[in-house]
Amino acid sequence: MTFIVCASALVLNTAVQVLRISILFLRCFLFSYKRPTAANRFGLLIDMDGVIYRGGEVIPGAVDFINNLVDQDIPFRFLTNNSQRTRLDLTAKLIGMGFRVANHHMYTCAIATARFLAKQKEKPTAYVLGETGLTTALNTNGIAIVDKNPDYVVVGEGRTYTFEMLEHATNLVLNGAKLIATNLDPNCPTANGKTRPGCGAVVNLLEKATGQTAFSPGKPSPVMMRDARKELTLDAGRTFMIGDTMTTDIRGGLELGYTTVLVLTGGTSQSDLANFAYQPTHVVDSIADLDVQWFNERVEPLSQHEQDSQACPV
């Protein structure tokens, strides 16, 4: 009799556990799509150098701004045309500066380039002029790095180029490899406040030597700008692009219908704006002038149809 009672209790307990697990899975299925709230009615794409730091110095107010986004669960991505660093490298750098960020917040032109190439050809191969951030992104996306007969010659930032490497890249392109630039920035700032030739300068050399024109998935290309926005799972009307450079951040954002915010702490001054045929949606002195309320007041309102459709699980 005791055995029967114990067995019955065991069966009942197991049934209860199965029911609890089933309910948990059902809840996950029904509520995996978040309803629009103040926290996810908009998202941000944020440039790094010149916006949250300048060289090795944090721009005042940047840490509080970013950490407040994290606290309020505002979706955002940092966008950088620097292909040298991996996501992990960038995360470690920002954490050291006081930002409470994670790997998924980082989106580089190296990642954009690797994802693009992975969609272009089955099992693509590449000869690489670049550093760890670029090679890691390519490997992660299944692109084999080779020295002979590559499908692509991929160029990123680097301090270890040799003339022999450039000569080899030139001949690979002349023999049929496609020339890919992670970005076309002519120069880039260094931590000590100096400037060195950027990826675009090296690519220009190869273009002149080969007669070929490079394709670049980096900012302001829609390849990078759109893919980053898709990671936020928001439409263009609820996406803000914050940057300091008119030719990449602001132009790229405007061309895709994002609301653009130019900060004057980096490469563009107020007087520079007169030189451009296009203008940012908003101009602020610094990221310190922005907060969540500022964006809530400027984001496109949700229509009743959107509220109803987004509130339903899909």
What are these regions (language model features)?
Residues 6-8, 20:
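Low-acidity, Ser/Thr- and Arg-rich intrinsically disordered low-complexity segments
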Residues 22-27:
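Hydrophobic alpha-helical signal peptides and transmembrane signal-/tail-anchor segments
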Residues 6, 28-74, 83-107, 114-314:
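Asp-based, Mg2+/Mn2+-dependent phosphohydrolase catalytic module
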